[in-house]
Amino acid sequence: MDDIIELAEGVAESLGEGAEVSFAPEFDLKGLKTKKLVVVPVGIESKPNARDYLEDRYKVQIGLLKKCTEDDVPELVREVVRIGRSFLQKYVCGLRCMKTEYVPHFSPEHLRERRQFTGVVELTFLTVHRTEP
């Protein structure tokens, strides 16, 4: 697999709930009563693993956005964690999710300025393959 876009689309499909792939997410949530799930392809990191083998790490971020109050934040943080954990050890497009990272869990600035929860989890998918001679 060498198509991070295909992986992002696979993650969005796995999420369901109207999740969509976006390359420059910026949303106006005025009037939005339900949550919005956005998948962003972040990048690919490649490095030698062993003789004649390469390790590729594909990184994809999932954003959960929702209008909310501060009282709603604990449950929304828990939901972001549940989403991330649901992908651990799971295969999407033939790649296995080996790591989830929540740094930060959400954006305090968005909460203060927009009354919007923006939580992000970064998924790392791993593949090891033989290099061409």
Label each residue range with its predicted role.
Residues 33-44:
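A short, hydrophobic beta-strand-centered structural micro-motif
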